[in-house]
Design a protein with these regions (language model features):
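Alpha-helical secondary-structure segments
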Residues: 49-56, 101-105, 182-183, 230-262
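Surface-exposed binding/hinge segments that line
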Residues: 34, 70-133
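N-terminal lobe/hinge region of extracytoplasmic solute-binding protein
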Residues: 1-26, 150
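Ligand-site clamp/hinge motif
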Residues: 171-216
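Aromatic- and charge-enriched surface segment that lines or borders ligand/interaction sites
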Residues: 20-69, 197, 256-259
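A structural "hinge/loop" feature
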Residues: 1, 18-20, 113-125, 236, ...
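Gly/Pro-rich hinge or "lid" segments in bacterial periplasmic/extracellular proteins
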Residues: 118-179, 183, 193
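Ligand-binding "clamshell"
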Residues: 215-228
């Protein structure tokens, strides 16, 4: 239901085949992002412009933003740190060229800017939706909590039953054309039941639990497909808090890891 503004190839190198093209100026420390069409639309029919992309950078860098996306990727943009700290009214490094292009000025050019998930943000939000909601209230918004959604993906949200299922239908405004499927229904299934459900042919696609591999590796009615993850998993222990003023993690001396298993 959502789509990145950029596409990438089998080596995770960003390409110019998606919603936008990229022009790197290594010496000038800039990246120019240009929408590949003036006719793109959000799933609610509203036009897509470069203002949506600029708005996304500005909003994630806003001092009231409480999400997890703001990091060194965004702070590498000229003027972002000052904007984030409330010392500037705008981000000086976001230079709008026209309604479909923006030149981003960076403090430093990083190799990962050419990679998916790297130092160039591929995230884009509908300004006409989120500009009407105070940034500090985003986490409570129905557009963030999932009951409503406006995106750029091949499908759009038709209905949701919390804790049970989500039903999607084709997005008639999808930039690559209408999806061939008329409907997609995603259901939450217990890991204890998914093997028997797939064996019975109830679902077309499922993410199978690794721990039960031996119980489904020989099923004749399914094709097993695997891939390398581009991320890592970790366990974090809450032993204090982050002090925003000092920019340091402060350990709580009363916090204890009393579980002997750990």
């Amino acid at each position: 239901i959502d789509a990145s503004i950029f596409e990438y190839d089998e080596n995770r190198q960003l390409t110019n085949t998606g919603l936008a093209s990229i022009d790197y100026d290594i010496e000038g420390k800039t990246v120019t992002v240009t929408l590949n069409s003036k006719d793109y639309k959000w799933s609610d029919g509203q036009p897509v412009t470069i203002d949506d992309y600029i708005f996304t950078y500005q909003s994630i860098g806003h001092k009231d933003y409480t999400g997890s996306r703001y990091n060194s990727k965004y702070e590498n943009v000229e003027g972002m740190k000052e904007f984030h700290e409330g010392k500037a009214d705008s981000v000086s490094g976001l230079e709008k060229i026209d309604d479909y292009s923006v030149k981003i000025h960076f403090k430093e050019m990083r190799p990962s800017m050419k990679l998916a998930g790297g130092a160039l943000s591929a995230y884009i939000m509908p300004k006409h939706i989120f500009s009407t909601i105070p940034v500090a209230e985003w986490d409570k918004s129905e557009y963030v909590r999932g009951t409503k959604f406006v995106g750029l993906g091949a499908f759009k949200l038709e209905s949701i039953i919390p804790g049970e299922s989500v039903t999607l239908v084709p997005n008639e405004h999808y930039y690559k054309g209408r999806a061939k499927l008329d409907k997609v229904v995603m259901e939450i299934v217990s890991p204890d039941n998914i093997v028997s459900e797939m064996k019975a042919g109830k679902y077309d696609i499922a993410e199978m639990p690794n721990a039960q591999y031996e119980s489904y590796k020989d099923l004749t009615n399914v094709n097993l497909v695997s891939t390398f993850k581009s991320s890592f998993e970790y366990i974090a222990f809450h032993l204090g808090k982050f002090d925003k003023a000092s920019g340091k993690n402060i350990t709580d001396p009363k916090a204890k890891m009393s579980d002997p298993v750990l």
